[in-house]
């Protein structure tokens, strides 16, 4: 039998993923910072999912961006439906810790969000982010439209040039369209650093500026 550590650097294969559950985890559907719903139809607004390491600090990066309507943290990109945090930490779900960003495209461009994403973490680290090691910390952009996907790919290629010039390796960010199912995380993880101001935040960027979104 494989130990939990076996799944820290690789995705679970067929038959290895935890079964999960059909029922969604309980959720208090109000954003602690802005009072907007965490879950809904969001008619007239755009959505994207970002994975950039521990989602506690990652969510704060985006709720502070003007034009963002709401944010929520959850699990995406894996195999286990409605996984719990402890299950995701085992590495046996295949999920990454993700932030759902719902935004008004008339108030903030997707390119501006991409710039925040790239500059807020090191996207060259594979299945880890800093001292946080595991598949749940991999870098990811899960797109809801083809236009988002095209922009994400273009931004990756542009940022790769800057990173290469600064001595970094290849970007390992997983970019997908259509976006996989987003499973909301437990209540305590939502807006975690607002509830726990001295809570852990292991995010750290490369210090390399992203050349997109500068004039948006």
From Swiss-Prot:
GO molecular function, one term: L-methionine-(S)-S-oxide reductase activity
Enzyme category, top tier: oxidoreductase
UniProt keyword terms in alphabetical order: Oxidoreductase
Active site: 54
One of the record's GO cellular component terms: cytoplasm
InterPro entries, alphabetized: Met_Sox_Rdtase_MsrA_dom (IPR002569), Met_Sox_Rdtase_MsrA_sf (IPR036509), MsrA_MetSO_reductase (IPR050162)
The keyword Ribosomal protein is assigned to this record: no
Function: Has an important function as a repair enzyme for proteins that have been inactivated by oxidation. Catalyzes the reversible oxidation-reduction of methionine sulfoxide in proteins to methionine.
Protein name according to UniProt: Peptide methionine sulfoxide reductase MsrA
